[in-house]
Amino acid sequence: MSNKIVITVDGPSGAGKGTLCYALAEKLGFTLLDSGAIYRVTALAALKSAVELDDEIALAALASALDVQFLPADGEVKILLNGENVSGQIRTQEVAEAASKVAVFPEVRKALLQRQQDFSTENGLIADGRDMGTVVFPNAQVKLFLDASAEERAKRRYKQLQNKGISGNFDQILAEIKARDFRDRNRAVAPLKPAEDALILDSTSLSIEEVIAQALSYIQQHLDIKA
């Protein structure tokens, strides 16, 4: 794994990691790993099978047995659980909240660690998550940490819901983001934090195009490659 190029992108929910990682994978021709989706799939599987979200042992067993696939399709990544396309289902607020709760358990993280590391490929990997640079790929050649204020992330989420014709309460969204940040940053195992050697990008006042440009420039300098 040490001879394969791995670029990690960590950061809180709503900072723009997904958009950045997809753009980087497309421009560099790398494979994309959305680790957050793996936790969301685990949470969805738990909700579907009535496994309690506080049952660490049952959740870890469920995570170990997951039949999940990531397939590029129509400009995005299609996610299959037991052969079923669950790309839309895992993006609901209910599943997002469940995933944040599931992710605090050490046994669940252990069960999913090897699965994530197995995504490392010969043509390079963009790993999107919360502990990619600190735990899953500590020897990655390039590490980025994408951040934004809770208020800005809530605005983005609120706008996304509006664009989809879904009603949303801004104050509730902001409260949920802050609560999730607290859980992610204060969990006992693999808390959300930048790797010591990560470049920190604050996207609060940046367009996604500016974020992509800064990230690409940093990657090209460190890896001596061109997009």
From Swiss-Prot:
Cellular component per GO, a single term: cytosol
Keyword Phosphoprotein: no
HAMAP family assigned to the protein according to its UniProt record, in alphabetical order: Cytidyl_kinase_type1
Pfam families registered for this protein in UniProt: Cytidylate_kin (PF02224)
Lineage: Bacteria, Pseudomonadati, Pseudomonadota, Gammaproteobacteria, Pasteurellales
Xref: NCBIfam families: cmk (TIGR00017)
Name recorded for this polypeptide: Cytidylate kinase
Enzymatic class: transferase
Major subcellular site: cytoplasm
GO molecular function: ATP binding; CMP kinase activity; dCMP kinase activity
SUPFAM superfamilies: P-loop containing nucleoside triphosphate hydrolases (SSF52540)
BP GO terms, sorted: nucleobase-containing small molecule interconversion; pyrimidine nucleotide metabolic process
EC number: 2.7.4.25
Compartment list: Cytoplasm
Keyword tags: ATP-binding, Cytoplasm, Kinase, Nucleotide-binding, Transferase
Catalytic activity of the protein: CMP + ATP = CDP + ADP; dCMP + ATP = dCDP + ADP
Gene of this entry: cmk
Disulphide linkage map: none
List of residues binding ATP: 11-19
Similarity-based family: Belongs to the cytidylate kinase family. Type 1 subfamily.
Keyword Cell membrane among record annotations: no
